[in-house]
Every structure is written in C-alpha cells, then in structure tokens.
Amino acid sequence: MFLIVGLGNPGSKYDNTRHNIGFEVIDNISNEYNIDINRQKFKGVYGEGFIANNKVILLKPTTYMNLSGDSVREVANFYKISNENIIVIYDDISLDIGRLRIREKGSAGGHNGIKSIIANLSTDVFPRIKVGVGQPNDNLVDYVLGKFSKEEKEVLKESIEAATNSVEEIIKQDINSAMNKFNGFKANKSI
C-alpha cells in the first residue's frame, strides 16, 4: 500500500497558488485513476483506490502547510504504511517552472511542510517529488502564496502530468527508475 500526499493549504483563497501545487497533482492523480477524494479524517481529505494494481491512499492534509506531518503520521500509523511507501509531492522554489526533481530522502530544504513530516515520521527517508515553481524576486511568503500566471499554468500542465506519471513509475517499478526517468524532465513549453 502507498500513501501519496500532496502538500498545500486548505481553503479557496489558496487555490492555484505556488504552495498548493501538491494539491493540484493529487487532483490530477485522482482524475487519471478515478479515485474520489471525499473522506475527511486524519486531519485531511483523502480517497482510496488503485494504481498499477497497488492500493493507494491519496491525501491532502487540511492542517495548513506547517502542520502537514500530523496528518501524514496519522494515516501512516492507521494503515501501517512504511516510510518508503509514502510519496510526498510539493513545490520547490529552487527549481524552474516546468522542472521536476525526485528524491528518496533528504533534508527539508527550508520547506516547512517537509520539515513537519520529517519531525512527525522521525526520518527523512521517504520519496518526494518536487515540482518547480520558480525563484521569488523578493518576498518569499508573498511569492509562494501568490497565484500562477496564465503562461505559468500552461507550462505547469506538463509538470503536473509528469509528476502524476512519476508516481505511477515509483509504484510500478521503484524510486530509482522514477529518478532516472523524470529527474531530467523539462516541460516543452517555457516562459
């Protein structure tokens, strides 16, 4: 069983913001694999289904970003999911829009959602898919809570699709296969 987590902040005012790209990828996975995200529990909204004949749980924590680990820990403990089978998808300001980076472990890199998950799981060993949202010119908080432009959204469609495909690759094959296949990903469209 796999737990696939998209990080973001709850509420419509955060829709289409850079910090919520994880939620957008989860929504895309939900659509592609016909998994309804309609249950509320574990400090989040979630749904259960199958990808590549493996049972998966799609989770969007509703704790706000900085407390995402509370929700992840509750689901992982309840379903007895090992850390290696927890895939976390989130925004990365160190990557250009249209890029992905997949890692099997590592530090939080300044991302408070990841910091919370590492603290709650007591390990930094869990797969993550970082979706590039570009570098801020000035205020970091304003930038990550800012909305994407129309041009950026066009490029991100490709990133979201690639992130969705990389989740399936991790589940069907393994993290190394996904890293080899997707770490060089660059959207065809650019800004």
Curated annotation (Swiss-Prot):
EC number: 3.1.1.29
Residue sites binding tRNA per the record: 14, 64, 66, 112
Principal cellular location given in the protein's record: cytoplasm
Keyword Hydrolase found: yes
GO MF annotation, one: tRNA binding
Positions of the record's site feature: Discriminates between blocked and unblocked aminoacyl-tRNA: 9
Gene Ontology CC annotations of this record: cytoplasm
Subcellular locations according to the entry: Cytoplasm
Annotated active site: 19 (proton acceptor)
Enzyme class name: hydrolase
Site location (Stabilizes the basic form of H active site to accept a proton): 91
UniProt cross-references to PANTHER family, sorted A to Z: PEPTIDYL-TRNA HYDROLASE
Family: Belongs to the PTH family.
Protein name per its UniProtKB record: Peptidyl-tRNA hydrolase
Organism: Clostridium botulinum (strain Alaska E43 / Type E3)
